[in-house]
Each structure stands twice: as C-alpha cells, then as structure tokens.
Design a protein with these regions (language model features):
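A residue-level detector for the "anchor" residue at the start of short, highly conserved motifs
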Residues: 1-87
Length: 87
C-alpha cells in the first residue's frame, strides 16, 4: 500500500467506509440519497480532518463528530464517530 486513497465514481457510503477503516473512525452517512452520491478523488498524506474539509468543498454535506471512549483491559480505547448529513 502506498498511502493513497483512490476513489473512482464510488458511492459516498463506500468512500466513507474505506476512509473510516484507514483512520480508525466510524463514519456514517445519515442521508440515503447522499450515501448514493458518486464520488471521485485521490487522497495522499492528508489527515482525516483535511479529507473531510476537502470533501465539504465538493459534496453538499456537513459532519458532526462525536468521540467515544471504551475501557479495554489494556487501557482506554478511543474512536472517532462521525455522522455525515446533507446540507
């Protein structure tokens, strides 16, 4: 893997699932029509925050972030949870 995320006309639901896997985040598209929105982009080296900011420039969306923590045997586990909604 070369650190690139490449999307070629993929539904946003799939795009956010793949981004979430890479950045250890649960990203949920709350609007069914928006989830089907086809997206094309290449990201390389951006942080999750940068990717979300860039996507807002071309997709009619906003996002609400909630971070949750879960106690694990070896310490506290933190994961980002992000809801994506239509503007």
């Amino acid at each position: 893997k070369d650190g690139k995320l490449i999307f070629r006309d993929e539904p946003l639901d799939d795009v956010f699932r793949k981004i979430g896997q890479v950045y250890n985040a649960d990203i949920v598209v709350m609007d069914k029509d928006l989830a089907k929105h086809m997206y094309r982009a290449t990201f390389q080296g951006e942080t999750l925050d940068e990717i979300l900011r860039l996507m807002k420039l071309t997709v009619p969306m906003k996002y609400i972030e909630k971070t949750f923590e879960k106690a694990m045997p070896n310490g506290v586990y933190s994961k980002r949870y992000i809801e994506v909604v239509r503007l």
